[in-house]
């Protein structure tokens, strides 16, 4: 049995298809984060981009997400050093820090339902940016991700 690509290749060596398959579809990267200007500490909120579908945990306009969502960032292999803002459970961040994929990851389980069952997605746990006045009121204390 061959070694899975995420264990045998660096992030830079992955094909576009392999790179895209690392995304577990949890939707956490679509939540707004706040950064302390003095310490650069990242604070996660439960405030979602208006383009995020909170039931499917995916973008409502995925093909056009980088032009539709003004704050949508494309994760690319040349930005690996910047992945510190991603959730600790994110495959891109974990592999960039030489950590294994979590046991519920779809590449390991073969389905996304294990991720949802483990409580690792944003499914039905968010508010939308259009409904929020003060994002600091929505900081998640001790996020599980």
Swiss-Prot record:
InterPro entries given in the database record: Puta_zinc/iron-chelating_dom, UCP006173
Family matches, as Pfam families: CxxCxxCC
Disulfide bonds, paired cysteine numbers: none
Highest taxon of the lineage: Bacteria
Similarity field: Belongs to the UPF0260 family.
PANTHER family: UPF0260 PROTEIN YCGN
Name of the featured protein: UPF0260 protein VV1_2014
Organism: Vibrio vulnificus (strain CMCP6)
